[in-house]
Amino acid sequence: MCADHGISSVLSLMQLVSSNFPVGSFAYSRGLEWAVENNWVNSVETFYSWQQQWIDGPLIYLEWPMLKRCYYYAQIRDEMNFFQCALRILSYRDTHELRLEERQRGKALSRIILQWYPFTDGGTWLSALEHSGLASIAWLGYTWSISLENLALGYAYNMLESATMAGLKLVPFGQITAQRLLRSLMERLPNDWKKSDMIADHELGNGFLLQSIASSCHETQYSRLFRS
């Protein structure tokens, strides 16, 4: 029974981080497209540095800590604090495009969730899921019995894979280079998760100013492939 349960959670995680599932989503570059257009990112090395800055800032100090908090509130069935967490995540998305992306991912995931788990206890849970893709991932992760650490690492992998595929088109570089970059970025994630697990509320924050600037400027970029 335990082995079957473990296999089921692994398969559920694989579904959740699949590129066909609306989690990281390949429609978004999160400012990378503008950074490439304006020569901030113009090589494999500068692309790698851009992703490292995302890990060292938003991932460790915002994405993972808020995922952890949402997971906890889903676990204890505290819908009001879960809802507040979803709103807080949205408030940290400091550009129009990043907020729009968060909502779009939330609405896409909530539509899928509703097909499997029709809510009968009011609209607070559903409203929270619609507000935030990250909150929706936390809710599904708990519901599917995926451990928090595996969920966090899977989420980070999905986001880095999406970014690498965007970089492959924009920088550009080849498939072999893309896989090498992704592998190198993945190797640091377990230790980074341990650091993120200790982040207190007063330490939460985005911490990637260049991405915020690039995302803001991308709103008016004339020719673009990505929504953000």
From Swiss-Prot:
Record-annotated membrane-spanning stretches: none
Where does it reside?
A: Cytoplasm
Sorted keywords for this record are: Chaperone, Cytoplasm, Nickel insertion
Question: Looking at the UniProt record for this protein, which Gene Ontology cellular component terms does it annotate, in alphabetical order?
Answer: cytoplasm
A Pfam family cross-referenced in the UniProt record is UreF
Superkingdom of this protein's organism: Bacteria
Database matches in InterPro entries: UreF (IPR002639), UreF_sf (IPR038277)
* Molecular-function annotations in GO: nickel cation binding
Q: How does it assemble?
A: UreD, UreF and UreG form a complex that acts as a GTP-hydrolysis-dependent molecular chaperone, activating the urease apoprotein by helping to assemble the nickel containing metallocenter of UreC. The UreE protein probably delivers the nickel.
> Per its database record, what is this protein's job?
Required for maturation of urease via the functional incorporation of the urease nickel metallocenter.
Q: Family, per the entry?
A: Belongs to the UreF family.
This one is known as Urease accessory protein UreF
Q: Which organism is the protein's source? A: Blochmanniella pennsylvanica (strain BPEN)
The uppermost taxa in this organism's lineage are: Bacteria, Pseudomonadati, Pseudomonadota, Gammaproteobacteria, Enterobacterales
